[in-house]
Structure formats: structure tokens, C-alpha cells
């Protein structure tokens, strides 16, 4: 691995905020210090040959920034009730993320009713682990996206503490109750619970009654104060599964600046028109549509009413979705922006990361295609090569 103060990437197609051009990139002390638009064969003084990455015509992109991904849950609990040590799962997952070109990951942790990693104890444990790992070492930049289920009344105090202790980077509000969001269609919630929990009609009726009882006791004023406190600390707030213009208006009233996964094109148009960032899932793009029949992400993006991509639950999809969008007619630099500078802006970090520009932190990936599939061959974080691979034949 290259760990020196200087590093040069030569002969690549550099994806900048305003376009793509072939050239060289020089990094010093973790900062992008020069960018030559025409590839140079001259040796840079002070940079040894072993600190040069010859991109050989590959793409040179900013490191990907993922603001919504819950894949860490499957790393800790790959099968129901089968938990692995968190530190082991985290460290192994980090290596996968570097290999997928993700240089900033906000791990999406759900604070809601349930067992395993979505329960309060394990969520708090994972957040503490992320904080300690961030302080000690890292291959990539880690953060926490707290997904708070509004009807999880007993978790409110923990959400307050996590925000006040500075352990949260991004907050979203979820309302997975019957008739709300992705369960807005009659019977959708009941069908989901019966399928995933293996319960009958009587049991699901009891679950619905209990959930609706909790939702009726939500203190919306306290919830609004929570989001205000988050925003005062520089934490972006998002809504989740907005299903109508009125839902967007409620989200705006709570200070949300990002709408995650709006369920229809009309809702995405409304949210974007109100100045919200609109975040859609990369798996939706790669697979050609929503897994549950909602908004087709490509439609909203080509319509110009969505500006952020996230991997949702499948980290490999983030890079693939960028090139899929290019094949759909979106210019490459605009597609790249959706997984780099746009999420950086949404988080208030665009002055440091998210694009290949002079003076920014050197979070960079080198990408080439194999069988028309984009693959990361080098990942650089803060000027250090944390991942590199080469085919043996």
C-alpha cells in the first residue's frame, strides 16, 4: 500500500464536477494539489515510481459517499438469531466497502421495535463501536445515520442522548404504520407482517392494534424539538417514504431537507420543487425498478427531480448505478455527482470531500470495466491507498 506523503495517478479519465478529461492527479499530505488536463510523462520531483498509479485509461472518480445503507445488519446477523461479534463484522465489512469504492459510509441503524440489531441495546452498542473505530483507525470514513421510528416511544430518550453526545451524523424519521409510507395501500402492512413473521390474521390484527395504539401516543411537539436540536448541531434531517405532497409538507415542517425514497414521481417532483434533496436507491436502478412496485428511480432522475443515490441495502450497486445511468443517457459527471458531491452537500461536507478539486481531501477511486461491469481497482482515502487489486492474467 502507498502510505507516503505524495501520490500521483497518471493517465486516467478524471471525472470532475463539470466534465471528464484525461490527465494526471497529484496528491500531497492527503490533499489534491494539482490536476493536469493532459497526461504528462514527466516524473514529478519527490515522487518515486512506486508512488505512482498508472490508471491506463481507467476512470478516476471521487470516492463514493453513501448516506443510507443498512447492510451492516446482515454482516452482524447473516441469519435470524445468529449474531457475530460486532467488531469482527464491522472490520470485515469495511474491507468490502473499500472494494466497492465507498470512501464515506453512513451506516443506517434503525431505532425501532424489534429484536436483533434494530433493538435499542444493539443499536447503541454498534454506534459506540463506530465512534471508537473512528477515533482509533479506519480504511474509510464512517458515520451514523440514525433511522428513528416515530412510534418507538421508549427509544426517544436514546435518540436524544445520541444526538446530544455527538454520535449521529444524519437523522431520518420513519413511520412504518399501516396506511403510512410504503404501507399506504390498504392491507399492505398486514401482508408484509404475515409474510415476514409467519403469523396469522388474528396475530397480525393484534400487532396492528398495538402499533396504532403507540402511534396515537406520539408526542409530535417533542419529535419536532428533537429534529430542531439535530439541525442546530449540523445534522441533516430526512423524511422516509413520502407518499404525497401533504407528506412532504409535514416533513418540511419537521425541518427535513432530504426526502428518501418518495413513492411516486409526483411526490419526488413536489419534494424537489420545494428545495429538498431527493434520495433514491441504487438497487432500483441496477435492477430496473422498485422491488415493491413503487417509483422507478431512473424515471425521476431523467426527469431531473432526484439528485442523490444511496446503496440502500446493497453496497455494490452504488458504483454500478452510476454507469447504468450513463447508459440511460445521463452524462457521466452528473451521474457521479449523485453519489459524491450531492450527498456531500446534503451533509454539509462539500468543502472537504465529494469531488476532485484542488484543495480537497484526496478520497479517490480508480475504476475500469470487466465484461462491461465497473470494478474498483484502487481506493484512496485521505491520500492513502487502502484498497488495490490486479487480475493475475
Located regions from the model:
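Histidine-rich, glycine-flanked metal-binding segment
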Residues: 1-8, 14-61
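Active-site glycine- and acidic-residue-rich loops that bind
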Residues: 146-157, 241-246, 250, 258-260, ...
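Metal-coordinating catalytic core of metallo-dependent amide/deamination hydrolases
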Residues: 111-242, 312
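C-terminal cap of metal-dependent C-N hydrolases
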Residues: 12, 340-341, 345, 357-393
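Metal-associated gating/positioning segment near the N- to mid-region
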Residues: 55-127
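His/Asp/Glu-enriched, well-ordered alpha-helical/loop segment
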Residues: 274-284, 288-369
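Glycine-enriched alpha-helix->loop->beta-strand junction motifs that scaffold or abut catalytic
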Residues: 165-169, 251-258, 273-279, 304-307
Amino acid at each position: 500500500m502507498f502510505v507516503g506523503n505524495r501520490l500521483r495517478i497518471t493517465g486516467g479519465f478524471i471525472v470532475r464536477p463539470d466534465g471528464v478529461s484525461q490527465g494526471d492527479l497529484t496528491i500531497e499530505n492527503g490533499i489534491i494539489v494539482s490536476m493536469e488536463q493532459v497526461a504528462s510523462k514527466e516524473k514529478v520531483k519527490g515522487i518515486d515510481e512506486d508512488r505512482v498509479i498508472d490508471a491506463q485509461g481507467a476512470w478516476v472518480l471521487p470516492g463514493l459517499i453513501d448516506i443510507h445503507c443498512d447492510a451492516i445488519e446482515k454482516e452482524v446477523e447473516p441469519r435470524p438469531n445468529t449474531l457475530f461479534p460486532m467488531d469482527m463484522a464491522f472490520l470485515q465489512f469495511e474491507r468490502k466497502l473499500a472494494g466497492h469504492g465507498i470512501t464515506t459510509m453512513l451506516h443506517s441503524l434503525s431505532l425501532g421495535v424489534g429484536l436483533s440489531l434494530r433493538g435499542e441495546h444493539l443499536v447503541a452498542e454498534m454506534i459506540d463501536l463506530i465512534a471508537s473505530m473512528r477515533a482509533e483507525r479506519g480504511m474509510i470514513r464512517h458515520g451514523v445515520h440514525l433511522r428513528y421510528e416515530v412510534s418507538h416511544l421508549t427509544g426517544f430518550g436514546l435518540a436524544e442522548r445520541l444526538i446530544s453526545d455527538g454520535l449521529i451524523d444524519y437523522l431520518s424519521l420513519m413511520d412504518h404504520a399501516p396506511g403510512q409510507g410504503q404501507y399506504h395501500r390498504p392491507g399492505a402492512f398486514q401482508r408484509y407482517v404475515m409474510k415476514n413473521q409467519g403469523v396469522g390474521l388474528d396475530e397480525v390484527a393484534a400487532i396492528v392494534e398495538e402499533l396504532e395504539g403507540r402511534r396515537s401516543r406520539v408526542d409530535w411537539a417533542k419529535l419536532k424539538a428533537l429534529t430542531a436540536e439535530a439541525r442546530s448541531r449540523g445534522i441533516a434531517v430526512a423524511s422516509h417514504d413520502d407518499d404525497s405532497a401533504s407528506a412532504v409538507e409535514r416533513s418540511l415542517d419537521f425541518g427535513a431537507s432530504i426526502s428518501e425514497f418518495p413513492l411516486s414521481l409526483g411526490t419526488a417532483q413536489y419534494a424537489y420543487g420545494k428545495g429538498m434533496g431527493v434520495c433514491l436507491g441504487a438497487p432500483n436502478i441496477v435492477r430496473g425498478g422498485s422491488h415493491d412496485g413503487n417509483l422507478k428511480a431512473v424515471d425521476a432522475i431523467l426527469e431531473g427531480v432526484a439528485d442523490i443515490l444511496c446503496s440502500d441495502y446493497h453496497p455494490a450497486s452504488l458504483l454500478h448505478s452510476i454507469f447504468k445511468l450513463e447508459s440511460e443517457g445521463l452524462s457521466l459527471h452528473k451521474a457521479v455527482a449523485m453519489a459524491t458531491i450531492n450527498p456531500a452537500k446534503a451533509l454539509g461536507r462539500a468543502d472537504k470531500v465529494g469531488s476532485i478539486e484542488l484543495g480537497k481531501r484526496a478520497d479517490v477511486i480508480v475504476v475500469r470495466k470487466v465484461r462491461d461491469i465497473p470494478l474498483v481497482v484502487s481506493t484512496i482515502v485521505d491520500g492513502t491507498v487502502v484498497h488495490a487489486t490486479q487480475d493475475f492474467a
